[in-house]
Every structure is written in C-alpha cells, then in structure tokens.
C-alpha cells in the first residue's frame, strides 16, 4: 500500500544516531525538547546562507554542546571567530545555560540529502525546470560517489493547474535493507504557483554491524 516509514527514523539505534543526546526527568523532558526545537529553528533561520546539513545537541551536566554540520564553515565562523561567538551568546539566551558551539564541515555536499533537497528547492524558486534541476543533482551525486539517488517533487509543477508528483532515480536505493546507509531529507520551494515539496533519498553503501562496533570503539578510544 502507500504507507512508507521515514528512512532515518527506522534506522535509529542501528546505523543512525539521535540528533539530540541527553537525559531528562519526565517533568523536564517536554521543556528540553521544546528548547531543542527552538534552537534548531533559530540556527537554520540565522544560517540560511551557510548550507547547514544537521544540528546535533548534547547536554552534559548543566551545559549544552551544539555541533553544526555545514558545507560553508567560513560563513558560520566569520572573521576571527566573531560570528560564532555572537551565535553562542544568542543561543545561550535561548537555553539559559552555558553553550559550546562546534563547527564540522560537510566534505561532500553533493551526497548530503538535506543540502541536495535545499539546492533543488532553490532552483525551483528561481524557475529552473524541475527535470533539469533533478537531473543535475543526480549527476553530481553519482559523480561524488553515491551508489544511488532518488528525487521526488510534488506540487503544481511548471505552473500546471492540477498538482502532481514526479520522480527520478539513478542507481539503486534499497529502502527495506536496514544496514543500507540511506540518507533522507525534505525541503520546500515557495513558488508563485504555490509550495512544491522536494524529497531526496541518497544511498551511500552498506554499514555492517562489525563496522558500527569499530566506530563506537574508536570513539571510546578517542575519549
């Protein structure tokens, strides 16, 4: 039938880590979760030009550690780190606890589902034909080492009166295999004809249980 689970959610705890890592009592859980949502919304809005892929939030003791994964770290950091310090102060006001901000560069934005989805959405807003935008994104992803990619756009494509969905795929995208490293993200293009939704699936290969254990051991060794 038409029921499809979120590819990221179904892999949590298996080959995917949670975006927020902390513990809270039942009385404080909703408050902390709401803080995380507000912080992510604020950072995505503030760093709209920085190509932010994901934001990870950790809360060790009474502090917060935020890791921003971006394809343009220079925009986030600013000259001599001034911008990131201003950002830290603003996030501190939102959370009310000491905040540490780390920046990690996304080495291959062409195979990052979030960045690809936003790129396609931006092209649609600039009136680029949707098939051309999809084809260009797929070619760039396959050249950068992706094993497969699927892109779907939905809405009043090309200004048509009736909304429809179109999709294209290159390579293979095994959604049913849990060990398959499938990156999934969505974006929205705000056009004069209305909102066009963009969904992107990128298959990067398989992650075996032994490899996962090795990664965890490496992290422990680094600590």
From Swiss-Prot:
UniProt function note: Binds the lower part of the 30S subunit head. Binds mRNA in the 70S ribosome, positioning it for translation.
Lineage summary: Bacteria, Pseudomonadati, Pseudomonadota, Gammaproteobacteria, Thiotrichales
Gene (name only): rpsC
Organism (species): Francisella tularensis subsp. mediasiatica (strain FSC147)
KW Calcium (keyword) present: no
Record family assignment: Belongs to the universal ribosomal protein uS3 family.
InterPro entries reported in the protein's UniProt record: KH_dom, KH_dom-like_a/b, KH_dom_type_2, KH_sf_prok-type, Ribosomal_S3_C_sf, Ribosomal_uS3_bac-typ, Ribosomal_uS3_C, Ribosomal_uS3_CS
Single GO cellular component term: cytosolic small ribosomal subunit
Superkingdom in the source lineage: Bacteria
Protein name from the UniProt record: Small ribosomal subunit protein uS3
Positions of the KH type-2 domain: 39-107
KW RNA-binding (keyword) present: yes
Subunit structure: Part of the 30S ribosomal subunit. Forms a tight complex with proteins S10 and S14.
Xref: Pfam families: KH_2, Ribosomal_S3_C
Any single biological process term in GO: translation
